[in-house]
């Protein structure tokens, strides 16, 4: 045993710098606290990009910084989060730059309720993925059960509370206790057997109940075997495990979850006074319906009585109806006859207008009129055509070459009969035809002068 643990550091009246002090303190801490276990709750969890994990480990009275480097963090199986209770192993070291000491960890394990909570979450996720919590699997509770099975401990306040509720609210319901342990490892197979037995007894509903306790005390109701036994029950089952704040896997699998065992009993035990009020309400509704029905039937009967009369009265009504129909038929016949008579008159008028003699007379008058108009039209047309012809003859005479020839001019034609317009079209000795106003001459070109010659228009 070291009597003076600081003697080995050589601190006899030596004046140290802060860095030297922190360095020697780190050596001392790492030498003494080399491989220790510490239990606490995680807070201020941080995961930087480096892959290291930093958090504060705390209990009700103190806290210490922890560092879990990347290579050790990769070996931690459970997900770390704030509030998780853990056990950590490592060494105590000192961060010289700030003078803060910390735990350098190599192992992190869940502790106490923390481990149970991880197992709870894992099983919950597994069963939820299988559909054991889905609403489609839930069976509705019977409205008026007669026989109920209770799976619980035969001792304790739970069974007494359940029986008390049924005695007060529904004393006529038959209760059967299927005793089982409700805590510890031995409780798991007992609860499974009790569920199978109760489901085979043909109860109207089942209650799975236990009083409050810690998460560890209630853990048997979070076991997979118990959850699957609850799911396998055909009988509607109410899970009432722990207090209102306690939630178990069996609560999720059961058809209905009750916050307490007493609440489970109230769900299945209809209140007698409430039933009496329901019956009274139904009685009042039935009386009202009967009165309404009687009133309706009475009115209907009175209406039928009014319609039911003496046969003689019915015959008089029929005779009156026949007279009315006869009068209506006569009026209709007269209206039809008048309508047809008026139509016949209109047709006769139209036919008279279409008589052949009348048509022939009209045609004869039209023919005579046309015969009178035709000679006059022919004379007028002939006169107009004559005037038009004279105008065209005058126009033709003005533009005709013959009129020009008549005034003393001539037209020279070559051997092909083409008109000679310029002297350049001729050559000396060429024979031409000169066409005059009357007759023609054969001429020969003695000479062709290409210079223009001005003609007098006064000759």
Curated annotation (Swiss-Prot):
CDD domains: ExoVII_LU_OBF. One of its GO terms (cellular component) is cytoplasm. It is found in: Cytoplasm. It comes from the Bacteria. It catalyses: Exonucleolytic cleavage in either 5'- to 3'- or 3'- to 5'-direction to yield nucleoside 5'-phosphates. One of its GO terms (biological process) is DNA catabolic process. The keyword Calcium does not apply. It is an enzyme of class 3 (hydrolase). Its EC number is 3.1.11.6. Keywords: Cytoplasm, Exonuclease, Hydrolase, Nuclease. The keyword Nuclease applies. GO terms for molecular function: exodeoxyribonuclease VII activity; nucleic acid binding. Heterooligomer composed of large and small subunits. Bidirectionally degrades single-stranded DNA into large acid-insoluble oligonucleotides, which are then degraded further into small acid-soluble oligonucleotides. Belongs to the XseA family. HAMAP family: Exonuc_7_L. This is Exodeoxyribonuclease 7 large subunit. It comes from Pseudomonas fluorescens (strain SBW25).
